[in-house]
Amino acid sequence: NKQPYVTMKYAMTMDGRIATHTGASKWITGEASRAYVMGLRNRHKGIMAGIGTVLADDPMLTCRIEKSTDRDTDNVRNPIRIVCDSKLRIPEDSQIVQTAGEIETIVATTAAGASDSAKCERLKDKGVSIIETEDVDGQVNLRQLMTILGGKGIDGILLEGGGELNYSMVSEGL
């Protein structure tokens, strides 16, 4: 089975951290880096984050490229948003859930998360697709998830995870 190619994106402070001492990670980089990341988002079919990032930052995970006359911006599109959330803790009022009807959104969870069938139904009603994977030490089975995503035609993923998801993906060789 074909699995997506994964590009891991992260910013790091001079002392090797991916967030400031307050936990803020949004403004470690500058304007040029953020513009580059928007281009990466536009080129990848999917974008993946963990529930920790969603809870900490309430991100949109969209492609925000300004219309421009000096470059090709006619084909700007949003990647499919993929959130790894083993216990289905994603807030129903998060920006990702609130915009799931407009931007394709997948939440990958385990049996523990999927056991909240009422929340699953509410998320589905808002446009979220739920993928249930096997449980690996209390976490989403990332290898199984990649196979499922590849089967859905997602050939490239921009990984914008925090330390935990990034470590897990690298450890699994994904």
Regions found by a protein language model. Name each.
Residues 173-174:
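C-terminal structured "cap/appendage" subdomains that terminate the fold
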